[in-house]
A protein has these predicted regions:
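General beta-strand structural signal in soluble alpha/beta enzymes
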Residues: 65-69, 94-96, 105-107, 126-127, ...
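Acidic beta-strand-loop-alpha-helix segment within the catalytic core
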Residues: 115, 120-196, 288-295, 299-325
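DPxDG-like acidic metal-binding loop motif
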Residues: 89-100, 104-123
């Protein structure tokens, strides 16, 4: 039976959870924004985490953490397998990044976000917390137009042909990290333009699905768990992504094998990383090409959020006004 057309039950719950997800990211974004430019990324991350955790605990759901926070946050953690929500209602898996772009926010820079995704039980692939090679494009292209096994030149020429443009008109987004230095050189040699970001590869990937973002393709190495969040977003927004684990040493190889990833050359697509009915929400913490940042004035916080649902392919932009007294 089509979940979306079924009477009662799960489809209605999904719609309700979409708005609840936005409330969670709004709370985290407001808390983090208060520390913008303060130079303390740990404090900002802790504030976002605490606000997100508190908001999650108020949702009528039996939530299980798939991707959480494991760096302490003042002694509080949410690890895979931990429970969130009231314990009543639908069973869901939760993947969260309370503050993407910690270093950006600490410097007062643009494009910090609060992110949350929810899936049916078993909906998120459980990667180890290691590096992940990624490539992503927006909707409207032939399947497998880009591939991690293609050369940089082939990927960009294929995309340019699909777009009906020249390679030098394309914009490639990727993290400004030493691990991407060779890729950056290759992109420049092919002739495409580059948008380097300091942090937050989930937001970079999401931009490929937003026609007016100015980004045509995302490439490079980031985090594996962030790849799952990005896949959740693209499931609702449209687009293609491939990812592959990047193992740097024996310890990381052991982590991957322990979780069942025996073929380290395997490529994963969105539908494998985020399966079934998915809800994804993001709220801007600071201004960026995807979302406006939190604006606080006269005891009022104004937020700008995006929520998408994979089953309907619906994208909603929501502006929220939050009295702070």
């Amino acid at each position: 039976m089509d979940r979306e057309n079924a009477n009662g039950g799960e489809a209605q719950i999904d719609r309700n959870l979409a708005m609840e997800a936005v409330r969670v990211t709004e709370a985290a974004a407001i808390a983090a924004n208060r520390l913008m430019g303060g130079g303390d990324e740990k404090a900002a991350d802790q504030a976002a985490f605490k606000a997100m955790f508190k908001a999650l605990q108020n949702i009528d759901m039996a939530g299980t953490v798939s991707i959480g926070e494991n760096e302490g946050n003042g002694g509080t953690k949410l690890l895979p397998g931990d429970s969130v929500g009231t314990g009543e209602g639908v069973n869901v898996e939760v993947a969260m990044v309370p503050l993407e772009g910690k270093s950006i926010l600490a410097r007062g820079g643009p494009n910090a976000l609060s992110l949350l995704a929810m899936a049916e039980a078993g909906g998120f692939l459980k990667f180890p917390d290691i590096y992940f090679e990624k490539i992503a494009v927006g909707a409207g292209h032939p399947k497998s137009i880009v591939d991690l096994d293609y050369s940089t030149e082939t990927n960009l020429k294929n995309l340019a042909e699909s777009n009906g443009c020249c390679v030098n008109e394309l914009v490639v987004c990727l993290l400004d990290r030493p691990r991407n230095a060779e890729l950056i050189t290759n992109i420049r040699e092919v002739g495409a333009r580059i948008r380097l970001i300091l942090d937050g590869d989930v937001s970079g990937i999401i931009q490929v699905a937003k026609p007016d973002s100015g980004v045509d393709i995302y490439m490079g190495i980031g985090g594996a768990q962030e790849g799952v969040l990005a896949a959740a977003a693209l499931r609702g927004m449209g687009g293609q992504m491939q990812g592959r684990l990047v193992v740097r040493n024996a310890e990381e190889e052991s982590k991957a094998i322990e979780l069942g990833f025996n073929d380290l050359n395997r490529k994963f697509v969105c539908e494998e990383m985020a399966y079934g009915n998915i809800t994804f929400a993001a709220t801007g913490v600071t201004y960026g090409p995807l979302l406006e940042g939190v604006h606080i004035s006269n005891e009022l916080a104004i937020t700008h959020s995006l929520v998408v649902r994979s089953q309907t392919k619906t994208m909603r932009y929501i502006k929220g006004y939050h009295p702070l007294k």
